[in-house]
């Protein structure tokens, strides 16, 4: 009995010894999967992502009946019944995704390079050369709407990457598409441009704005000696920044204020003296009257005695 118990204990200890490392390995794998996420070296292409978005949008529209009806869905259905001519947002989103997918395929197939070679004919010997200005002016209005859509899509896609990888002809075409004749190309004349803006402030039909009035084609030859006659240059000296001295204009104002103050003080003092003199005269007269009345009384008393 004792031997059988010893054998059972040995078997259990041996199994525990073998199971322990297995548990540790499994726990280690779980921790690695939990805290470590492998970095994908290859990014899924944009066309595949667009296809996935289109498929999810279509599947969402087909499986929406199986899901519980939400309040927003019921309200959208009610408004769609009340306004049958209103645009469908899901349909617009799906059409936009299809359009992006089509433009992505056109861009990946190299259609933009075909358009640039056809209309602008960049140099085949040097891939980083600018397009001739005359060719750009003549052939850019010939681009169709589909070509311009592809160009806009290419600009939006390539501007997200490294701009140092862009070619000079594409940058030139990008700048021309965005700004046209603005900036340094003010001397160019666009043949198919809109007419000049009419005056909306005065509302006179015969007055038109001309944005090139300020440009003078004549070269102005001004010598350095004539610059002083055209522009008066003021040189600031250190006396202007000295707080101990006062400029002549400030001195004149301060002197005028002091003069006016002294004049007002003298005038007020003279008026005060003229008011005091009548009071003194009245007191003297009253004293004289008193002395005269006393003298008369003294004379009367002497005559009666």
UniProtKB/Swiss-Prot annotation:
Residues 1-24 form a transit peptide. Keywords: Membrane, Mitochondrion, Transit peptide, Transmembrane, Transmembrane helix. GO terms for cellular component: mitochondrial membrane. It is found in: Mitochondrion membrane. The chain crosses the membrane at residues 250-266. It is a single-pass membrane protein. Signal peptide: none annotated. Disulfide bonds: none annotated. Involved in respiratory growth and required for cell survival in the absence of prohibitins or GEM1. Belongs to the GEP7 family. This is Genetic interactor of prohibitin 7, mitochondrial. The lineage of its organism: Eukaryota, Fungi, Dikarya, Ascomycota, Saccharomycotina.
């Amino acid at each position: 009995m004792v031997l059988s118990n010893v054998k059972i204990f040995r078997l259990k200890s041996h199994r525990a010894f073998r199971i322990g490392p297995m548990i540790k390995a499994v726990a280690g794998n779980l921790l690695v999967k939990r805290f470590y996420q492998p970095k994908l070296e290859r990014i899924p292409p944009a066309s595949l992502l667009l296809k996935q978005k289109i498929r999810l949008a279509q599947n969402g529209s087909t499986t929406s009946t199986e899901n519980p009806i939400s309040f927003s869905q019921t309200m959208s259905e009610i408004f769609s019944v009340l306004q049958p001519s209103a645009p469908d947002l899901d349909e617009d989103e799906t059409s936009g995704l299809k359009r992006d997918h089509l433009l992505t395929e056109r861009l990946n197939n190299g259609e933009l390079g075909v358009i640039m070679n056809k209309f602008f004919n960049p140099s085949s010997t040097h891939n980083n050369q600018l397009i001739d200005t005359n060719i750009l002016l003549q052939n850019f209005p010939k681009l169709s709407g589909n070509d311009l859509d592809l160009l806009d899509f290419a600009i939006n896609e390539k501007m997200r990457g490294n701009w140092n990888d862009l070619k000079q002809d594409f940058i030139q075409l990008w700048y021309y598409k965005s700004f046209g004749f603005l900036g340094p190309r003010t001397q160019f004349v666009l043949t198919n441009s809109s007419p000049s803006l009419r005056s909306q402030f005065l509302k006179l039909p015969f007055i038109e704005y001309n944005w090139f009035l300020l440009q003078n084609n004549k070269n102005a030859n001004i010598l350095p000696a004539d610059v002083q006659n055209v522009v008066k240059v003021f040189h600031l000296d250190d006396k202007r920044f000295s707080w101990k001295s006062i400029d002549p204009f400030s001195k004149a104002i301060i002197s005028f204020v002091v003069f006016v103050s002294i004049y007002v003080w003298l005038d007020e003092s003279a008026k005060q003296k003229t008011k005091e003199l009548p009071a003194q005269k009245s007191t003297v007269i009253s004293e004289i009257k008193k002395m005269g009345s006393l003298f008369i009384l003294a004379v009367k008393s002497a005559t009666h005695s």
